[in-house]
């Protein structure tokens, strides 16, 4: 594939020990040699070596930076192109200067995700593996990173390719049936083979979809909304879980006027914690905006932490709020157990029925462990499944698998109903195409561009 040479900073901007400028493309080594001065020309050194030298401005002859340069020659590289990585001291000014010099002497600034896109276009990885690269970068927990690494290694890809190959074998048998319709024994054998193989494919798709709920949570986080009357301790709970003071905690009811969101690792489960403004009628315009956002957050939540105040008796407002959330996955928390108990716990139990109940004191940090265990148990039965198994964690993949399950079921129904094989062939082919979209073999250029545009620069 004839592509130009791209360049980008591949490390986070800011002060640090090391900053890396990466080049990839047919002119990568040549461009670097125009700037690099060391014991040998980079063009003359072996592949996969690191070389000490300096970056020199060819025009002013000024020494710009002391560097270590990695030379990686195609095809045994991430992009399957020649790659140069210039390791600089991690300062904004210097690394930008090196980047500008690479562009001055022939490289183009890379688009977001373009290095990974080239790896995909050059056949180094497929689309699901490319998406997993960004999942790995963005992972919030050890489990999430392991799920992403599993996909980077191609385990999901291998399963999808296996199912697509099975469909091709069915289609080949169907073609024989279509070409020789006069042989009844061929038709009977084809129908039997089609049904047997199609049901196995559907079973495998179902197995993958069964991992989707856990996989999606590990990838995106469990959207968890903290809700309750104003001043029951919602923000204190958020702060205790994230060990931060992002939310303002005061004695004035209604001081959380917006939706505050933070990620937290709860026993290996990534929670996307949302602290909402108290949901109540208000004339304050700023607070009213926060209340509306709270209602929206509630409608999108995977888990709701419903907080009550141990120091106050249940009110009609508590009952009204619980009525709003009771049909969702809820954990009820009676907070402020360090204060005098004015709430009737039996009344609380009557209101919530079998809903889990935890008693906490955020001030004394009591009950937090019990809360974390309850969250884990509620969604994962106390233990996430074997980390070596292949999870489907990407919403796009889950959607496509659901479509594939439907089209393979359509093929099964049609075959069992005696529909002509050329009609069954349509559903089988569509299933093959849908599965191909997961790994990028049948994905449109527009979809590919859109997916890679979500990557960070330098990746």
Swiss-Prot record:
Cofactor binding comment, as recorded: Binds 1 potassium ion per subunit.
BP term (GO), one: tRNA methylation
Binding site for Mg(2+): 235, 256
The EC number(s) this enzyme carries: 3.6.-.-
Broad EC category: hydrolase
Record InterPro entries: G_TrmE, GTP-bd, GTP-bd_TrmE_N, GTPase_MnmE, MnmE_dom2, MnmE_helical, P-loop_NTPase, Small_GTP-bd
Function: Exhibits a very high intrinsic GTPase hydrolysis rate. Involved in the addition of a carboxymethylaminomethyl (cmnm) group at the wobble position (U34) of certain tRNAs, forming tRNA-cmnm(5)s(2)U34.
Name used for this protein in its record: tRNA modification GTPase MnmE
Gene name linked to the record: mnmE
């Amino acid at each position: 594939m004839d592509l130009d040479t791209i360049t980008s900073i591949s490390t986070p901007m800011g002060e640090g020990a090391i900053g890396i400028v990466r080049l990839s493309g047919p002119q990568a080594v040549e461009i670097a040699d125009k700037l690099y001065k060391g014991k040998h020309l980079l063009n003359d050194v072996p592949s996969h070596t690191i070389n000490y030298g300096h970056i020199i401005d060819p025009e002013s002859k000024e020494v710009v930076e002391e560097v270590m340069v990695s030379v990686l020659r195609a095809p045994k590289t991430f992009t399957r192109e020649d790659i140069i990585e210039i390791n600089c001291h991690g300062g904004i000014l210097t690394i930008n200067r090196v980047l500008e010099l690479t562009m001055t002497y022939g490289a183009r600034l890379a688009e977001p995700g373009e290095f990974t896109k080239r790896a995909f276009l050059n056949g180094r990885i497929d689309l699901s593996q490319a998406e997993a690269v960004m999942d790995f970068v963005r992972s919030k927990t050890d489990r999430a990173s392991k799920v992403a690494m599993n996909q980077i290694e191609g385990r999901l890809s291998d399963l999808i390719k296996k199912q697509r190959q099975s469909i091709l074998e069915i289609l080949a048998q169907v073609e024989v049936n279509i070409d020789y319709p006069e042989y009844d024994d061929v038709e009977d054998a084809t129908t039997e083979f089609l049904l047997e193989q199609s049901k196995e494919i559907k079973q495998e798709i179902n197995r993958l979809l069964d991992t989707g709920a856990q996989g999606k949570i590990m990838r995106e986080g469990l959207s968890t909304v903290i809700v309750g009357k104003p001043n029951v301790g919602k923000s204190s709970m958020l702060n205790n879980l994230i060990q931060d003071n992002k939310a303002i905690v005061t004695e004035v009811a209604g001081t959380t006027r917006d939706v505050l969101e933070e990620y937290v690792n709860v026993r290996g489960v990534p929670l996307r914690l949302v602290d909402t403004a108290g949901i109540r009628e208000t004339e304050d315009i700023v607070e009213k905006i926060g209340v509306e956002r709270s209602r929206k957050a509630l409608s999108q939540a995977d888990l709701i932490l419903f907080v009550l105040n141990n120091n106050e008796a249940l009110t009609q407002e508590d009952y009204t709020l619980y009525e709003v959330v009771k049909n969702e996955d809820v954990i009820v928390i009676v907070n402020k157990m360090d204060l005098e108990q004015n709430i009737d716990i039996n009344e609380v139990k009557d209101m919530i029925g079998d809903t889990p109940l935890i008693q906490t004191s955020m001030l004394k940090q009591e009950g937090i462990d019990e809360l974390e265990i309850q969250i884990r148990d509620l969604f994962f039965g106390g233990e996430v499944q074997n980390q070596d198994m292949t999870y489907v964690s990407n919403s796009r993949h889950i959607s496509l698998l659901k479509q594939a399950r439907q089209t393979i079921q359509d093929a099964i129904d049609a075959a069992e109903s005696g529909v002509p094989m050329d009609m069954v062939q349509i559903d089988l082919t569509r299933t093959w195409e849908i599965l191909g979209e997961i790994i990028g073999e049948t994905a449109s250029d527009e979809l590919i561009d859109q997916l890679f545009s979500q990557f960070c620069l330098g990746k």
